[in-house]
């Protein structure tokens, strides 16, 4: 396993366990304590973990970590969610991609489509799209660059979305609350609101760790969401509550025929 893959796996392990020792991680990943300590130093510098005496815990104070760090968490689940999301795209579609780490996983899969129009405020997504060989039109809104999310925000960005109507919006989230709706830690969330208003269909992409979480800022109500793509870890009662709100819940790996 490559170091970056192992570091992503360590974060996923900590998501489940909360805290653990170096020895436990070394045994789980079949490697040495020295190797694990090197990984933990890198993750600590990234702000995603806090090292303790002989062990490590997730850094829960880092409520809105940089996009490069988010991509390391629940990577496999995000890839499966992205694969499911792409199945709802067709040649000729116009789509919005938000700047989330789950949505970012969609980009390599877009190479199969031609004559699609993609608007995004994410610099990472634009760079990745430019590497594809398919026929596409890429639109960016402009605005003020936010380094933490590698994306553009502000009034200029919001105004840009008001001038277009798109077929679909693919959007991630930091938390889904049955009462509050789709929420985020991102303090410059109003551009996400503008994206919702510009799309005929809102497709929410979230792994099951996001359910029941309520972040400070509300992007939209659940009534605004048409589809939710998630993994099999969703609580059945939570799924039923979402479906009662009219949301089509798609579970990765589950037949939806």
Curated annotation (Swiss-Prot):
Record organism: Escherichia coli (strain K12)
SMART domains in the record: DeoRC (SM01134), HTH_DEOR (SM00420)
Signal sequence, renumbered to the chain: none
NCBIfam families cross-referenced by the UniProt entry: PRK10434.1
Induction statement: By glucitol.
Residue spans binding DNA: 20-39
Full protein name: Glucitol operon repressor
Keyword Repressor in record: yes
GO biological process, one term: phosphoenolpyruvate-dependent sugar phosphotransferase system
